[in-house]
């Protein structure tokens, strides 16, 4: 999960048998300067993100989910909104999904682009219609999040990884990466490399290997710092 915190443990913090509304929120507010991994992921395959949201919402018993996205990325907003509409038409969202008795409404919320809304509690304030400001913790969102109800906030990459783990099993995922950092992640390379872009690779990959994925340093340039 985000910052390396185990996602399963985070989902497990949601109270059981509390008879309260639960919420599942995806933080797609990619606001760090130079960060550009969520945008290409959502453009390439928004459906895998929606599938992860459905699985996560079912796991924490949430019937309402949100994707919070920056207003500047109009092309991504259009792409994700179309994918949501496709999912509704296919019966993967809405009432009584696939006849299984599970309801899920998914809303794409377009933010105003405030940098601070990348922080999860400021994002929740913004979703509620207030100015985004970080909240004092505790309580944490899993106990009192959106509308003071139990809420999970995950980033795009985390949620999009869920379907492949469900399909292939936790042992498959744990076999990737290193002993202390299992799995894979997205790396963004820019600057003077031959093939700048985003690369999915195991955690623990070396800088040399990442540069090789990007085709190496361009002629006439040297690696100055990392």
Give residue spans per PLM region.
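Short amphipathic, charge-patterned alpha-helical segments
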Residues: 52-56, 203-218
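Hydrophobic alpha-helical positions that pack around
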Residues: 77-203, 215-218
